[in-house]
Amino acid sequence: MRQDDLKLLGKIVTTHGIRGQLKVASFSGEFDTILSLETVVLKGKDGRMETFPVARATVHHDRVLLSLTPFTNINEVLHLISAVSYAHRDQFPPLEEGEYYWCDLIGLQVVTAAGTVIGRLDSILPTESHDVYVVRGADREYLIPAVEDVVVQVDLEAGTMTVSPPEGLLDL
């Protein structure tokens, strides 16, 4: 199995009901990607990775309920609790222009419009109004709002994100 195109999605937190459904906590907070999957790759506590067909996926409160083939009862899935879920990138649904999956943004080099390297995009914090990019520089961490006025360009091919931070933002 090629692991270079596997993208981290979430974690199995518990079971649901007696028919072998699993509750998945999405790391990105969005569900559409998980709901669209035909297969999911689970990495167990032992580090072993297994691929399972998705029989059904639905949203339940702040989690996704997954039914995986061939499981039909709770006893068959108990060993999957705490497994981390991945999917192959080519299964993700297409996005609108200017939209990006978090997994595609993490690791981008962040530079100012003037060409100054700020650091690498390390993680993303979801907030009510907009996401916040956590950028690790050489000696500190920067919080960059993910808004059009600040994020000028994302070039996935070049591996860069160009930002035009308001005066003083990088001094905070």
Swiss-Prot record:
Q: Which Pfam families match?
A: PRC_RimM, RimM
Which Gene3D superfamilies does the record associate with it? Answer: PRC-barrel domain, RimM
| Entry keyword set | Chaperone, Cytoplasm, Ribosome biogenesis, rRNA processing
Note the SUPFAM superfamilies from the entry. PRC-barrel domain, Translation proteins
Gene Ontology terms for molecular function: ribosome binding
Q: Which residues form the PRC barrel domain?
A: 97-169
Its chief place of residence is cytoplasm
Any single Gene Ontology cellular-component annotation: cytosol
Gene Ontology biological process terms from the UniProt entry: maturation of SSU-rRNA
Query: Source organism's superkingdom?
Result: Bacteria
HAMAP family xref list: Ribosome_mat_RimM (MF_00014)
Family matches, as PANTHER family: RIBOSOME MATURATION FACTOR RIMM (PTHR33692:SF1)
Similarity comment: Belongs to the RimM family.
Query: Can you state the subunit structure given in the record?
Result: Binds ribosomal protein uS19.
Domain topic, free-text comment: The PRC barrel domain binds ribosomal protein uS19.
Quote the function comment for this protein: An accessory protein needed during the final step in the assembly of 30S ribosomal subunit, possibly for assembly of the head region. Essential for efficient processing of 16S rRNA. May be needed both before and after RbfA during the maturation of 16S rRNA. It has affinity for free ribosomal 30S subunits but not for 70S ribosomes.
State the name under which the record lists this protein.
Ribosome maturation factor RimM
- What organism does the UniProt record list as the source? Geobacter sulfurreducens (strain ATCC 51573 / DSM 12127 / PCA)
Upper lineage is: Bacteria, Pseudomonadati, Thermodesulfobacteriota, Desulfuromonadia, Geobacterales
By which gene is this protein encoded?
rimM
